[in-house]
Amino acid sequence: LMTLIIILAVAELTFRTFLKKFAACMIIFGIWDIFYYIFLKIYLDWPESFFTWDILFLLPFPWVGPVLAPILLSLSLIYAGVVILVEMNRGYHFQIDKRFWIMEIIAGIIIIISFMINGIVVINQTIPASFPWIIFLVGLFFGLVVFHYCLVKDSNVLSDP
């Protein structure tokens, strides 16, 4: 909880607009999450691999998945946050409507479901047999496609000058 409060405080103190603050939170959280695993590897020699199981959250139900899943999610957050900040600093004004937020929330819920599916297995003190990669990747790619469609398509980020 304190980590999230610090991330929110840094974003609040750094930027004025909601979208820039939100983008900063995405970047900071993504970097923090990746370095969390880097330092665990340096100091504890854990995880053994990108496919080592990790308990991500415990509320309201255990969220579990291989280390690679939150790293992919963090890289996606960093990417989206950087695109938003770079384009806004170039003067682009994003037109975000309610549909965008609804679709991104749906993508997030799909990802959360992929982490919670094996929660009961962990409660029973066993290691899950497999991770629902298809569900996770559907949520991740849906979120990225929505991002590109609603934010990037008109900003010329991906086109040559």
PLM regions and their residue ranges:
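Alpha-helical transmembrane segments in multipass membrane proteins, preferentially the mid-helix core
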Residues: 8-13, 73-92
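Membrane-interface loop-to-helix entry segments
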Residues: 1-6, 58-79, 134-135
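Interfacial segments of alpha-helical transmembrane regions
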Residues: 16-31, 93-104
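Membrane-interface capping segments at transmembrane-helix boundaries
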Residues: 83-92, 147-161
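Juxtamembrane "helix-exit" motif on the non-cytosolic side of transmembrane helices
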Residues: 41, 45-46, 87-88, 114-125
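Non-cytosolic membrane-interface motifs at loop->transmembrane helix junctions
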Residues: 51-59, 123-135
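Transmembrane alpha-helix/helix-exit interface in multi-pass inner-membrane proteins
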Residues: 30-48
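Membrane-helix boundary/juxtamembrane motif in polytopic membrane proteins
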Residues: 88-108, 126-130
